[in-house]
């Protein structure tokens, strides 16, 4: 009876925490001026296009092309913008207020912030023996100003944070209970959604593969579970394809085999961007014939330190 009571208190605590994160992100989303955050107007154009036309935009469409950059965010995965368009259409049934539609589009990330809070709390429970340490970990991660900021405006970064938290939760579960069917299905869904977020989150997909393969080896006997590895690995890959494959197939068809859309985006930036923002005119390592080591030691503009020193200080 006492154990059941403790479990109930634990669940009660996690939902209080999720609600607190949700309210904080919502308050920030309600207070933030439109386009005060990075490229929010460009991102909102995608939401607006989907809500207006009821279809997904082509990244080359002049209607959504930014006059300065010469490109649009439609070249990249747009899942949060699709969800935002649904909420915008619902809000438009009641009001034509521009501010209301912006808040509706932001609500996708506010909800994702609450979802990340749940996964972070659960990760803390699995990683730390003392509940206080786990809760401190969750608070530290979810109330980091940068984290809350990303859940306050229209972007795909929020989905990246949500899915990477889900992936890390899957890793923790795999360590505790093995690669069960439930864990494999969750990992497949999480990785598929991660592919529909930002490309800079793909490192978690690579490390998930490394982690999974490592888990399939017996640590003491140094033998591989080949059959289980293939069976469960194919299951997860199949789920990833079902969740995310459609987007990359679509991009490949639209952009003549450019399934990531990055090459086409660069071509259009070079063609339509203002002179100082054209890829060929920007101060980039690739345009300066830098090696990887040169990039690490490079001190751009008015920065005080190079990349290597910055990373070392941050990690310390």
Annotated model-derived regions:
Residues 21, 137-142, 191-195:
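Short helix- or helix-capping micro-motifs
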Residues 183-199:
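Membrane-interface alpha helices of multi-pass inner-membrane proteins
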Residues 9-41, 48-58, 68, 236-253:
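Transmembrane signal-anchor helices characteristic of membrane glycosylation enzymes that use polyprenol
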Residues 103-128, 166:
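Transmembrane-helix motifs of polytopic, lipid-linked glycan transferases
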Residues 173-176, 204-241, 254:
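Perimembrane helix-loop-helix junctions
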Residues 255-316:
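Membrane-lumen/periplasm interface segments of multi-pass, membrane-embedded glycan/lipid transferases
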Residues 12, 96-99, 120-143, 162:
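Transmembrane-helix signature of polytopic, membrane-embedded enzymes
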Residues 146-159:
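Short acidic/glycine- and proline-prone juxtamembrane loop motifs at membrane-interface regions
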